[in-house]
């Protein structure tokens, strides 16, 4: 079991040892996986080909409350791994090891905060770069009691540099933070920024494919992306 980091309180809902074999109603893989026996430890590893992946199904009790997935992965060679829920951006993060980042030959952790939108949830580990396979030892999912603001002191609390999140694509609002409305997305995003000591949010008003505002000269797309109960993404746009 992966423990919560220091300072967090919550209830454990699910834990997985990824080296164990599980039934088809709680585990899947696309492309063969293997259980590797290494000096770092035992872990499950996907194929070298991009988009090969394995994933787990788990249940939570209270959609809309903040949760944390604590994931242990091997830092023993070059890897490029995507982590997501298979549907939207609620649980999305990634891992790079090797290359410009010298490997530590140890197990490392991701501590990923997310707001699940369903009781029936999933988590997927996917190879994204050729020859850089996804690999995980295990993970645990917790429902958190709260997400209090970070306790900042001194000059940091009264200024200092700007630190925050810049969206490359307009993928937020209805497709991340488990949100179903713009107000819900903004509230959760601000809660997360305060919790992590960040003070800046940059969101695109124009991107590769066009503006995010009504325009007389160019079609506007992706005003709003929404993940519905059927687990499909829908979007509004102009023509």
Regions found by a protein language model. Give the residues of each.
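Glycan-processing catalytic domains of CAZymes
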Residues: 63, 69-76, 86-93, 97-104, ...
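Glycan-recognition and processing domains
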Residues: 1-62, 89-90
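Surface-exposed beta-strand/loop patches in extracellular or lumenal glycoproteins
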Residues: 53-57, 79, 125
